[in-house]
Amino acid sequence: MKILALKRKEQSVIPGFGLTFGISLTMLSILILIPLASILVYSFRLSPLEFWKLVTEKPVLNAFFTSVICSFIAAAVNCVFGVILAWVLIRYDFFGKRFLDGMLELPFALPTAVAGITLSKMYSDTGMVGKYFAKIGIKISYTHVGIIIALIFVGIPFVVRAVQPILEKLDNQYEEAAYILGADGKTTFWKVIFPEIRPALLTGFGLAFSRGLGEYGSVIYISGNSLKEHTQVVSYVIMQKLNYVDYPSATAIALLMLVISFILLFLINFVQMNQFKRTNNV
């Protein structure tokens, strides 16, 4: 009986499972489930034919294409530079390291509208950086390149923060053993380091891609939102539909975005679960 009592005591949770679960479920319902359910309920008013017609309009398809391609490119670039930045922050000590690490939180703390205005001015034809590209005929602001730069800015922390803990736990002995066995730096990275950080890198890629797909504030100022140049993104199209009180179109597009986001989250969780199982098996 004493053993059972001790076992029950170890399993108890303070302030109690019922209370904590109730609070969690209430907050989850208010902040996430109810708003998502309202989108689903409103979308049920549309017939399948009406829904298909709304989401396959040419401006909507162009916006989806722009958002997906630019988000994918930005997330891929973030994976490359995110790994490099995480490696530098973990493996080296240098002056200003803490400042650089803290600056990674800036995209989280800075209002996206402020970031968008700053980037659009900086990369305009007369801006601090854009004027040098303008001299060689390269336009950044109000183009797809500008959109990608904005998405890189808001997405880079997701990759770095996902990879950093893995690199921090990775023992240097694996690299030393590879070096002793005759492996060069390139082989060591691809055969020893990359397999360890790959799940975290995929997670960071998925999070950066998802953030880019739904980004609004930092993109609308630098994209130009031109129908002719196909620089409108999905979030801008949804806002435009709402401004014109076209709720059916806005709901249909939002629902499609919601489905894409859920698929991405499912894939991210699937990768994490597989990695967890592999780690436990080892």
Sequence positions of predicted segments:
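Membrane-cytosol interface at the C-terminal ends of specific transmembrane alpha-helices
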Residues: 136-179, 205, 266, 270
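Periplasmic/extracellular loop-to-transmembrane helix junction in inner-membrane transport proteins
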Residues: 9-14, 18, 39-76, 91-92, ...
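Interhelical loop and adjacent transmembrane-helix boundary motif
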Residues: 12-16, 58, 216-267
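Amphipathic cytosolic juxtamembrane alpha-helices at the membrane-cytosol interface
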Residues: 10-12, 95-99, 144-146, 170-203
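Transmembrane alpha-helices
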Residues: 22-27, 106, 153-155, 159-171, ...
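Transmembrane-helix boundary motif in ABC transporter permease subunits
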Residues: 3-12, 72-104, 117, 121, ...
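Membrane-interfacial helix termini and adjacent extracytoplasmic/periplasmic loops
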Residues: 4-10, 48-56, 61, 97, ...
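C-terminal transmembrane helix and the adjacent membrane-cytosol boundary/short C-terminal tail
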Residues: 2-4, 12-15, 19-23, 31-34, ...
